[in-house]
Amino acid sequence: MRFLLRHIHRQPTRPEWLCRVPRIVVIAVVMAAAACGTRVTADEPAGLSLVREKNFLIVRSSALSGAEIRINYLEAYCRAGSTDADWVKHTVIPHTSEVVEAGPQTVRIRDRVSDGLVVDHVITAGRDEVDFRLTATNPTDKRSEAHWAQACPRLGAFAGVDPQSRDIEDYVPKCFLFLDGSLARMPTRDWAKQARYMPGQVWCPTHVPRTDVNPRPLNPHVPSNGLIGVFSGDESLVFATAWEPYQELFQGVARCVHADFRLGGLAAGETKQIRGKVYVVPADIPKLLQRYEKDFPEHQTTK
């Protein structure tokens, strides 16, 4: 299309009937594309792109058909002993977030937790994933109280639910994780329905005390791995996320799913590396698992 338009501008001396032909061709191409449901745009960026807006990290892509993914990043840094504790009075540790760099492909953030912990985030958008590389440092002379933290991806639009609906669980049938080595749609079996705060669902891995997770209903089953996700409204795409190390998998009340990452309480002077992924890929689960297992070899699948 650009070639045709350049052709028109560079040949102003041609007879009028010759100039009209390319324009007719261009119009025909655009009309045919519209009839087929194809969106024709100029210079459309390839892959995913990022925007930092207040406390949200926004993921955009032409593949999302206008449904951007908004991630509350980070929602909270959290203390241990959180499963049956007051979320505000006990669990959440205040923090501030400073944007160091904000471009469409790379965002750098520095978080300062009120107990002195400093966490530097390097977030990079790729063709069909967002990569997270975190460095947590405790420059103080006391152990940090931050044992885990949560990024909250809001996925209602991606899942295709009615934005006017007041049913905050309407997206749950689109959500999944892995139990007994197989994909399990939510609500899974033995869905827990009692907790300090309702509704929601938490899955705790074997390496984390069951007293140190989100104060929502705690499922009795242990997840097979650290991957959790949501199918798109038409089931053609999957949003999935994982972190290493991870604290829990969580289906929440903001039409969200979390793979919350683990800090473990850094000792004085200690530094830790944390990494994470968001995948926005075709709904080919075997291929997704292969990719996840390559990215997170530490996450051995349990059956």
For each predicted feature, which ranges?
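Acidic-aromatic substrate-binding/catalytic surfaces of carbohydrate-active enzymes
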Residues: D43-T96, G103-P104
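N-terminal secretory signal peptides that target proteins for export/translocation
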Residues: M1-R20
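Acidic (Asp/Glu-rich), glycine- and aromatic
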Residues: A125-D180
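Low-complexity, serine/threonine/proline-enriched polar segments
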Residues: R166-R216
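Bacterial N-terminal signal peptides
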Residues: P22-A35
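Beta-strand-rich recognition/accessory modules
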Residues: V40, V99-E101, R110-R112, P199-K303
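Extended, loop-rich substrate-binding clefts of extracytoplasmic carbohydrate-active enzymes
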Residues: A80-R127, H147
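Beta-strand secondary-structure signal
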Residues: R108-R110, D120, D131-T135, Q273-K277
